[in-house]
Structures are given as structure tokens and as C-alpha cells.
């Protein structure tokens, strides 16, 4: 009897030891979490987006946005931190074609998707940056040509299928000068280059710094893209702060029903050793750091400032 009790004790003891060893073993992270820990966490993040303000450059045919304090519809009084413990902002945006954008094809063709109908697979892609700023410095009306793309590929290799291609012109360095919206000469992307990128390299979409694809009288490049079901990015910023190859881009925008334009947020995810950007852990995130000055409403500017 004692022998059986002893054997039972041994079995239970071994089971406990095995269980203890099992729970002590670290559970491997799922593959995508490993990608975050090993690559994305130490990467450098660069914002490629303009801030929307009441004075940003806007095509004159749309008019300027206006900001105001949100009011209680019953009393007409603005919400305040002192009286209501919160404040909010009312935005009078004359168009969804404003600032840094993602153009859905429905902007020119109602048979294709609007902004809320774009697939979630747009969220993150390889980023290619093709520089033409030196040629633009000589000719403000210069447009990306197929030869510029081939020259880039000779140095960096073939453009990845499904990637996003941004064209660096440094046009955005004068942002937010209002005159940018009235210029008739500005850098663009030629129709031949657009067709090559989409039909030969099968990219997801391209992006440019100006508010239009090209300066042709009929906007031939934009017309071809949107009428044939392609999207494009406009008003992209800070392309001088991202590498020409090796980065990713995240793509975010509000999901407005039937939207014919998209206020977009583009973030470049660059290699850890890149000279620009910020990495996870370098600045407070949760909680975020308090600012040196509090936000307040500036009546003259018509916007909250610090």
C-alpha cells in the first residue's frame, strides 16, 4: 500500500514539475508581433502630411476652410473647459479636396469607389521615392518622365509591385504660402510615366507634392488615373526626409460616405539608422507629455494655438 502511495506521490510530483517547466517557458510572439518588436519598434517614423489650417493653400474654386468653437445647439454658447470641462471644434471645410489627400477614382468617375469604399489593404505598403527636385529647380514645370523611373531603377532595382511611389520635387517647401494654390507652373507627373508605373510596374498608387497631377490644360494625367479606377496622393510633404528605397508608408484617412476626396495622413516608416524621424520610446506616448503652453482660441487667426 505504501508503495502505491509513494508511486502516486512521484506521479503527482513529476506532473507538477512538468507543469512548472511548461509555464516557465516563454510563449513565442506571433509572427506579426515579432515584426513589430524586431523592426517596427526601432524604425524611424516621419510624417509626410501637412497640417490643415484656415490659411492653407486651396484651389480658389473651393474657398478657404473656417474653424470655430463648437456650440451647444440649444443655447448657442461655445463649450468651454471652465463651464463644461471640455471643448470641441467646428470645421467648415468647403471641400474634401484639401491639404494632403488621397484621391479616390470616384472624384472623376462615379462608377469607381469613393473614399469609404477603398479596401483596407491600402493600409501599409513599400515606399519608393523618385527625386526630380534638381530638374524642377531648372524648370518649375518639369514632369516626371519614364527615363527618370528607369534611372532610379538602375540604381535601386525594380520598383516593387503593389508599392506606393512618391515623386519628390521639393515644391512643398514653400507650404503654406497661399500663392501655391494659384501657380500655373508647377512640377508634375507625365501621362507616360503614370501609365508606365501602373501598367508596367503594377504599383498601388503614386503621390506628388503639388495639389494637381500635372499642369496640362485638361489635367490629362489625373483624368487618365481616376477615370480608369486608380487612386493618387496629392499634397505630400517632407519627401526630402525619407530614403528613396527601403521604407514603408502607412496610409490613413477618414471614412466619409460617398467621399470624393480624402484628408489623408501618410507616415513613412524608415530604417532604424535613418537620419530623420522618431522611434517608439523616444518621446512620451502613454501618457503623452504636457505642452509648455495651453491651447487657446485665437480670434484673429480663427484657430486654436499654444
Segments from the language model and where they lie:
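Bacterial N-terminal signal peptides
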Residues: 8-18
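Active-/binding-site microenvironments in catalytic and ligand-binding cores
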Residues: 22-306
